[in-house]
Amino acid sequence: MIPMQFALRRRMIIAGGGGAPISDLPLGTLIRILYSDGGKGVADYEIADINNLVSGGVVLVRKNIHSNSAFGSTDSYPNGTLDNLINTTIYNNMPQKLRDKMMDVTFGLLTVSGIEDITRKMFALTRTMAGFGGSEGKALQLYTSDASRVKTFNGSASNWRLSSQHIADGGVWVVQTDGSATNYSSSSSYGVVPAFVIPSETPYDPTPNTDGSYNLIL
């Protein structure tokens, strides 16, 4: 059997050297993003969804935690601390060519008044996207078990924030170190895990990096 990277390279050559589309890769594949990241300069994002949350789009979710942050001064995500960090600060640190590729994503957030839609280029996952049910977008295809949701910060499993309010008990949803979810105060500091969507035909270089990740061709 021909190894995947050689089969993909052959496809790229046949296609004229433009790279294979990212949607050819399986869920969980790591995509390396080169950007200003706390001095490290790179971070891996995992393919979490293909042509599901957004038709014609691939959802990339940071493999591990970017930093820690409060949710905000209230339990409402739009324009709060977490939203502004992801949609402004982290977004602005992405390469311009990648920002140009990012698709607008519209999804609903449950409030005490019902579902309210927001549109973002970069965002924190909702509880629905993370696989905990509800009606805030769609469940991403990768997150089908607690184990699939575990994320680390500085090498240790750590809690990370979702964008959803916990209407029944107050506070906001947080994914715990074992991949389950519960509610915590919006003022507490927990992990930041950004996500974004790019077109499914976006090409990538089929030669993997040493950690098994792949680079986009932008």
Which residues does each predicted region cover?
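N-terminal low-complexity, intrinsically disordered "leader/linker" segments enriched in small/polar
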Residues: 1-18
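Collagenous Gly-X-Y triple-helix signature in extracellular proteins
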Residues: 16-218
